[in-house]
Every structure is written in structure tokens, then in C-alpha cells.
Amino acid sequence: SGGSLGNIPITVAADAYWNPLGPTLLADGSVNPNRLPGLVGVPDEGLPVTIRSLNYVDAGMKTVNVTNYQYRFLGGLRGSFGDWNWESAGLYTWATVKDVMDGTSSTLLQAAINKTTPDAYNPFNGGCVDTPSVGDCTVNDPSVIDSFRIQSTRRNKTTLALWDLKISNANLLDLWGGNSIGIASGVEFRRETYKDDRDPRQGGVAGVDITYTDAVTGIFYGSDLMGASPSPDVSGRRKVWSAYAELAIPLVSPEMEIPMIRSFDIQVAGRYESYSDVGDVAKPKIAASWDLLQGFRLRGSWSQGFRAPNLEVLNTATLDRVNGGTEYVLCEADLRAGRISSFAECARSVSVLRRSGGNPDLKPEESTSWNFGAVFQPPLPDGMGQVTFTVDRWRIKQKGVVGLLDYQNALNLDYLLRVQGSSNPAVVRREPTADDIALVAGTGLEPVGELLYVTAPFQNLLPIQVDGIDFNLDYRVTTSSFGSFGLNVNAARLIKYQIDAPAAVQAVIDAQADGTINAAVPVSGGGDVVNRDGQPRWRISGNLTWDYGPVRIGAFTQFISDVYQNDVFDAAGNNFVVDGQTTVNLYATYKFDQGMMKGTAITIGARNIFDKNPPLASSGYLSSLYQPQARYWYTSIKKSF
């Protein structure tokens, strides 16, 4: 089924047949049986009703058919001359996706609702007078439902054409002790294209697409596809030239027998890329590894990197999306007027339309990173297998990360500026009504009009620094009687995730500190976000396998530590904590190695074997961390030729 968006409402006309606030008399002069009795303040001609959030369940389930094709053509040559090896290849690949989905037309739905005869669609049905939570005594006729059901189609295509030339020489220059400097370098050209063709009912462009204008209010909303914000077609292309080089320099080798330096290697590399749309960029890298003893290695690296903005964020015209937010300026009015005693009682939730768009002036994201660590492979007695333990401490600093200023931060800044007597121009509102004026009367605040949308174009944001430490344990052993066993455990600890606050966010933080606005307003997009929302401090996973002839049995487990929700508080002002979770998957595989079934592997498995629910959060669960699927079994057959 499908539901409406809060920012694209359906207005039920005053004279619509099923309007519970409709006229006292129908068009034929008979008494309106659908007008609620005992209404006060509702005129005889009735009043319109605005539907902002309703799931039209009797419209049936949505079926989505996805057709995906991928093609790849690759050809190349390789050869050598002297100590040099070379390789050149050409590649062309493209992928197409077609999504066909059942949907609802807002225009046709409103027309069906606003009929003045009994064959109108009734959005207020469900339940019965005597049993309101059971059954439906006012079922809509299927032909009425069919009048506004549609199918929407979205087509997407990407292409990549690439040519490259690589050369390498493992003995470019002789060094002491029989060592040699090796080199690898190359050039590359690629052409990328992207096209996203939305359904005409979702494009939102007047005169081009099938759009929705509320027939009662006359307000233009763009998208006629219910539950979908306006999304125009997007297309873009770019050409990229790149070149790279890498030197491998072995300064010390085991044959040199230097105490405490079994080997010492250095890697020096660099890469340059020239984009037709975002300019040029060049970045270096240096890495080193030092084997003190056999089985014990220290390693480290320092590098700079970059990532170009994708074609969608560069070329999108206007992109509307709806999220839930809170109007804290109205909470301030409620607090000053005595309607609430604290912000914990605030109930000013609102649907926020975020209006973003592509930005052709975006620059590549840039990063500087380092890591150092150790690898320990202690010798074990014969028959005991091999164990490897690694630990790596790392840091990544990013600048110019492509993103959007959070819509709630824009509302928070509007709250601050309105307390100071102005407003945030990125927050667009209607002119205040009489009710809006009455709401702030006596509070010292200026009237606040209904929220229309928040503008938030893609931009290069301020720096981010992420620190962490990774641990890995890998153990393998093969026995003569019981097959082979493998154990791998990974643990990642997030130490720091510092986001430099944009000016708008920092202004809110400072205003909270000096008491200008309420300190209970949650602020995102600034500070250290470890343990907050989607950034748990610990992630641990383990994989255990047993191989015996053609049989493999395996188990996988994953643990994610708890986090707190930045925008959810209890009455004491404490953040709501979302519990951690551990899940387990099991599988068994049988691989045939002879006969007609040779190369065939059959797998039976179960994911989330203990049927764990995702931990409770304010939105149900945190989709960025957890999967909602219950325990389920699966089987697969794979054939290798």
C-alpha cells in the first residue's frame, strides 16, 4: 500500500460525499448522512479537510518489478621488452535498471475523493460503528480504487569506457645486498555517463511532466506520484585522464643478516587525475615495513587521497525529500506561554521538505591519512597450524566532504535567529495566519508561519577527523583425521569521530552555552559523534569454518555496541540509549568434484539463527546499523565451469 507525504497533502472538498465535516444537506436536498453530529463552529456548507498522512491500505500491496542488465567487454595485450613488462587494455561496460512499481496518482485520488455522490472514494473508512478496530463496514468499491491506481517506471543507465597502459620493471636500479628498486607506472583515460529517467508523474516540471495541483487550494505540488517527492531527470558525463607511478625500494633483505632488521622496505607512490568537470588533483603516498625478526613486522604509511563528486550531485537540478523534524521555535513559544514546563514535553514535530540541488562548483573531497601497526606470526609446533595477529592504529582527516547541511540544523538556526529578532533565509515559510499570531502572543516572539521547505544545496563541508584501532586474529590448522579448521576474529574500535561544526551549527552551540536558546535542543553535524546514532564504539565479527572433504560448515557472528540517539531525551534530559546487538549466521556447503555435478556447490544456511529483533529506537530501529529481517533459511546452487 502507499501513503501520502506531509508536504504533499490531499484536500477533501467541503462538499465531498464522505467528508465528515461536509454540508448538512447533499446536492439533491437530502440530509447528509456522513456529517458528524453535534459539530460546533462548522458552517452548514461544511469545511474542507486536509489529509497530510494516511496510508491507503485498501489500495492493495505495492508490487515492484526490477529488471537489471549488465554488460562488460574487455580486451587487451601484454608483452615485455628487456626487463620491462607492459600491458594495455580497453574496457566498455554499461548497466541498465528498469523499476516498474504500483502506485497512486494524487490527482486521480483527489478526484475520486471529492465526488459528491456515493461512488466517491471514502478515505475515512475502516472498522465498524460497534467494532471500530475490527473489519470494515464501509468498503470502497474496487472499481473506485482502480480509478487512481497507476504504474510508475524509472529507468537508469550508466556507462564506462576505459583505456589504460601499464609498465613495470622489478629491476630498475640495483642496490646493495642484491636488492633492486622496482617501478610500476601507467596512464589511464575513462569516460563516465549517468542517466536517471524518472516517471513523468514524479518529475515535477510543469508543462513537461504529469504534475499535481490541489484542486481545492490551487497549490502546485509537482509530483503526482503519491509518497514520492518531485525528482527531475538527471544526466551527466565526464572525462578523466590519470597517471600514476610507484617505486618499491628494498633497503634491507634477510640475506644481509643485519641484527634486528631482517628486512626493511619502502614504497613511494603518487597519482594525478584531471577531470573535465571538477579540475585537477595530485596526491602522494609513502609506506614502509620493517621485519625485526622472523614472524614480527612493524608497518606504517602516510598518504593523501581524493574523491571526485559523483555525477548525480553535480548535475541534479532540484531534489525534494521529506523528513521528520521539530520546530523548536514553537517549543520556545510554548515554554514562554506556560503550555509546557520543559523542552522534554515539546510536541512540535513537523514534516520537513528539504529542497536540495546539484552544485557544478563542487570540488573533489581530499584526505590525509596515516596508520601504523604490527603483524605477529609466532611459530607453532608441527601440526598446530598457523596463527596471525595484527593491530593497526589509524587516522583519517577529510576536508571538502560533499554533503548537505542537515535540515534540522537549519531549523535550529531559525530558532536562534528568531529569538534574536530575525530569521534564517534558508527556511521558507508561509505568511503567518491569525492562529500563528495567537500562538506567540505575549511571548516576545514574532509570529512563525507554516514551514514550506528548507533549502540545502550540496556543498563541500568542513573537515572531519576519524581515529580508530583495528585488531585481527586469524588461525588455520589442518589435521589428518578431522579436516581443516579456520577461525578469524576482527575487532574495530572507533576512538574519535570529530566533525568540525559549520558556522550555522557552531552558532547554535554557542547560543546554548550562553543561554540564548534552550540547551535541550539536539545538535548534529558538529563535535565528537562516537557512540552517537550510527557510530558505535565497537564492531566485532567472527568467522569459524570446518572443511572435511567436500563439506564445509561455517558460522558467522557480529556484535555492534550500543549507541545513544542525539535527538531523543527522557524527562530528565538524558539521551535514549539504543542497545547493542549480537547476531549469528550458519551455513553448510557440499561441493561435488566428479561426475556430471563436478564444479557444483549446494549451500543451505540460516541468517539471524536466534531470531534477534533489531534494538528499539525512536524510529523503530536504526537502519544504518541493524537489519530488520527475522530468522530466515536459504539455499543456493552455484556451478563453476
Stretches found by the model and what they are:
Residues 1, 86-88, 181-187, 243, ...:
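Transmembrane beta-strands of outer-membrane beta-barrel proteins
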Residues 2, 69, 99-105, 196-202, ...:
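Outer-membrane beta-barrel translocator domains and adjoining extracellular loop/strand segments
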Residues 321, 490-596:
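C-terminal beta-barrel architecture of Gram-negative outer-membrane proteins
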Residues 1-240, 254, 303, 307-364, ...:
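Surface-exposed, low-complexity loop segments enriched in small/polar and acidic residues
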Residues 108, 388, 399, 495-498, ...:
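C-terminal beta-signal and adjacent terminal beta-strands/loops
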Residues 67-71, 159-161, 237-243, 280-282, ...:
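Residues that define the transmembrane beta-barrel architecture of outer-membrane proteins
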Residues 81-83, 92-98, 171, 187-195, ...:
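Transmembrane beta-strands of outer-membrane beta-barrel pores
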Residues 79-86, 170-181, 252-264, 295, ...:
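Short loop/turn motifs that connect adjacent beta-strands in outer-membrane beta-barrel proteins
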